[in-house]
């Protein structure tokens, strides 16, 4: 099935002073091929880093502008110092401060023809003065913004920035109504309201605790000649035995007259160069080019080496005049094609059809295995080392996709995941409910365009999603209209990727075994693409992070995101546990069993209808009790090991619907083998052994859920006391064994046999399975059952 025609990205208005603002006025400029790729004798481009110690002063009464704190002659001797980049949370007096904070920095004039002042990331409002003159403002947290300062510089300069991370008054209500009634004012996604961040999402006064404000990314002076690059878009198109790359170059001429320059391009990996003569008109110019690459190496996710690897190309672009390089830019890109199966319904809300939500990369069907992701809300703390470490965790658990959940990470994440071959489902920065007036809608549309432009060239980004859990309910129809407009805009801008209107619609968020019901109820479901499922678990380190952690105090634990009453519903009252460690271990065992069961069920239903699954989520990014399988110190918990096993490329498993059986009952367990490799494994054997062992039974308590935390939206309340059979002692006597032969085809999921047993007396059992080819064990698994 052919997808839509792929074209270069369409342009749409962005936020004032965005780095993409010049593109809107770009003039189409003709180019002429030129001979040779000349070396240059002098480079006029570069940058001056303004990071380091800045002066700052909080402005609780908002008097700074009236009192002229932007005046370069103002003495700032009594102002304190702060490292930039940083977040307000790094300074105790600013951790819960929502008024303006003023920053000042002195610097010398650099030697350059053209100078731009670049802010790579400020959260959330910024107003900028240079030498007492106001340059402008910016709103948002993820998109860089800039000002031309060439003619405003002195020998000694004073830069002043007023930054405010506002308190969102749209977060209101009480208890669960906080989520339903909130009409937030600022599109910050999970960064200011979420059930996995500091505070208490059921308490609007605490929900925004330890905010994310600050100058959290570097500030730089960009130096160049009078003609410089604004941006480059790269759009790869796969063809038979070749690829065509659409190259859209935006460059600005800051002079008053047209000027002829050379545009030099080089793709390093294929050792090819091109040179063009360009007549750059005053203002921004758009140059459209194409480059044919024969027998291209394609970008594939890391876990399919039989298909390819995440190959990247490097495009070096230079603007040259009279042997001088006025500016240069390096863009890395991958050649890959992504298609999401199924057809959109008439409203564009979901995909339908037999291939709905099945993923195709470069024409090859790929079963998605992954999780939701947030590195930290305090983005000044990220680094290449942190992202590479998280990539190792993701790949170590056999995952090939993350959903960057209702926020945007700094560009470094996307660079690392391009290199590592990890696919990204990228949410726009909307979470739950918002105001939906025309002004807010237009703001969101401009920011959505910025998101797409900023990360357009990254092959790891395979989908844009406009909103997470928008809560389209009868008294909040505005959100539906907002999402319709965002979906239409994203579809018009980027024709190279699938667009999803709202997560939770079409894809599935399933919390059976947490927000009601039992996790084994998922066996009855047929979901094309679950993108959230999981339960909370307590890290053993949690006791070190908060005072008086045991016995648990509801208010303190809730501040750290713990849904204690739900934990007790599925684990039993904390009072029956002898220690914090015992309670924490029970939570991890329960989470591990739940995640393992979910993933195995989704893989049994592979392509019938399930195209993949994403757990919620990888890590608890701050000291908290959350849905992560890794704690904030990056220590894996039991749930991580469960996902690692359940996501293995080859899986042997049983399709069970109960783990506790009656005495004398004939138990029959269907055995399934799943192969995600696109290679035939041929003849293999499934071997199984049954042991007498000593298991652990975790028994819940129905009263906790209803008494402690009323949740009216639960559509499947807990009618039965949850009982979860978990590993206990690993020893035990072997009772029986067996084996059968199987043919394991490529990219398949098949029922291959059955294991049966019957016991007349109570017994604890451990079932061990292995998939064997010759002397090699390709996969193994184990289960725990009780006969009572």
Where are these regions (language model features)?
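Substrate-binding/catalytic cleft of secreted carbohydrate-active enzymes
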Residues: 401-632
């Amino acid at each position: 099935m052919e997808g839509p025609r792929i074209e270069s990205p369409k342009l749409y208005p962005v936020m004032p002073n965005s780095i993409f603002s010049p593109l809107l006025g770009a003039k189409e400029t003709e180019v002429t091929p030129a001979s040779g790729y000349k070396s240059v004798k002098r480079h006029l481009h570069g940058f001056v880093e303004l990071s380091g110690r800045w002066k700052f002063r909080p402005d609780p009464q908002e008097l700074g502008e009236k009192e002229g704190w932007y005046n370069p002659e103002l003495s700032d001797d009594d102002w304190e110092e702060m490292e930039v980049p940083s977040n307000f949370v790094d300074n105790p007096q600013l951790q819960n401060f929502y008024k303006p904070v003023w920053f000042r920095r002195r610097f010398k004039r650099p030697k350059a023809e053209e100078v731009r002042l670049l802010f790579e990331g400020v959260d959330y409002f910024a107003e900028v003065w240079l030498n007492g003159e106001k340059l402008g403002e910016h709103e948002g947290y993820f998109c860089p913004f800039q000002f031309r300062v060439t003619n405003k510089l002195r020998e000694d300069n004073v830069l002043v920035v007023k930054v405010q991370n506002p308190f969102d008054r749209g977060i209101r209500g009480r208890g669960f109504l906080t989520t339903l009634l909130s009409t937030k004012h600022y599109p910050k996604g999970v960064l200011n309201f979420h059930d996995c961040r500091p505070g208490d999402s059921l308490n609007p006064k605490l929900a925004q605790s330890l905010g994310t404000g600050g100058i959290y990314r570097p500030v730089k002076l960009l130096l160049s000649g009078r003609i410089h690059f604004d941006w480059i878009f790269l759009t790869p198109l796969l063809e038979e035995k070749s690829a065509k790359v659409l190259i859209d170059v935006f460059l600005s001429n800051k002079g008053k007259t047209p000027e002829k320059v050379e545009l030099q391009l080089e793709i390093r990996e294929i050792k090819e160069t091109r040179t063009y003569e360009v007549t750059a008109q005053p203002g921004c110019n758009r140059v459209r080019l194409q480059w044919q690459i024969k027998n291209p190496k394609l970008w594939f996710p890391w876990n399919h080496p039989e298909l390819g690897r995440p190959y990247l190309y490097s495009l070096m672009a230079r603007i040259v005049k009279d042997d001088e390089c006025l500016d240069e830019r390096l863009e890395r890109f991958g050649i890959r094609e992504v298609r999401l199966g199924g057809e959109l319904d008439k409203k564009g809300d979901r995909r339908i059809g037999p291939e709905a939500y099945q993923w195709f990369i470069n024409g090859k069907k790929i079963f998605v295995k992954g999780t939701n992701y947030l590195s930290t809300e305090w983005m000044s703390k990220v680094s290449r080392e942190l992202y590479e470490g998280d990539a190792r965790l993701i790949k170590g658990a056999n995952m090939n996709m993350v959903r960057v959940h209702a926020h945007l990470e700094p560009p470094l994440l996307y660079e690392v995941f391009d290199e590592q071959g990890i696919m990204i489902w990228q949410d726009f920065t909307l979470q739950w409910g918002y105001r939906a007036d025309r002004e807010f809608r237009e703001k969101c549309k401009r920011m959505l365009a910025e998101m797409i432009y900023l990360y357009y060239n990254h092959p790891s980004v395979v989908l844009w999603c406009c909103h997470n859990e928008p809560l389209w309910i009868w008294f909040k129809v505005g959100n539906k209209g907002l999402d319709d407009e965002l979906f239409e805009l994203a579809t018009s801008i980027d024709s190279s990727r699938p667009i999803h209107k709202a997560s939770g619609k079409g894809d599935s968020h399933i919390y059976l075994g947490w927000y009601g019901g039992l996790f084994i109820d998922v066996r009855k479901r047929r979901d094309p693409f679950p993108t959230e499922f999981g339960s909370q678990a307590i890290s053993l380190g949690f006791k070190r992070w908060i005072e008086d952690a045991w016995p648990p105090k509801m208010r303190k634990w809730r501040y750290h995101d713990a849904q204690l009453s739900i934990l007790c519903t599925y684990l039993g009252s904390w009072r029956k546990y002898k220690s914090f460690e015992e309670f924490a271990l029970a939570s991890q065992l329960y989470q591990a069993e739940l995640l393992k069961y979910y993933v195995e069920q989704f893989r049994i239903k592979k392509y019938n209808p399930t195209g993949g699954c994403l757990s919620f989520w990888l890590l608890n990014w701050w000291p908290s009790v959350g849905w992560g399988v890794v704690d904030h110190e990056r220590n894996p918990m039991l749930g991580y090991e469960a996902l690692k096993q359940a996501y293995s490329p080859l899986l042997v498993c049983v399709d069970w619907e109960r783990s506790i059986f009656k005495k004398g009952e004939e138990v029959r367990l269907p055995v399934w083998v799943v192969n995600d490799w696109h290679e035939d494994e041929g003849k293999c054997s499934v071997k199984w052994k049954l042991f007498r062992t000593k298991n652990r039974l975790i028994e819940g308590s129905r009263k906790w859920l209803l008494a402690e935390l009323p949740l009216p939206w639960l559509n499947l309340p807990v009618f039965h006391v949850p009982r979860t059979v978990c590993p206990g002692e690993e020893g035990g006597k072997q009772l029986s064994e067996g084996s059968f032969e199987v043919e394991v085809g490529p990219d398949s999921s098949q029922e291959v046999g059955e294991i049966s047993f019957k016991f007349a007396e109570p017994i604890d059992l451990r079932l061990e399975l292995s998939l064997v080819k010759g002397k090699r064990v390709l996969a193994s698994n184990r289960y725990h059952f009780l006969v009572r």
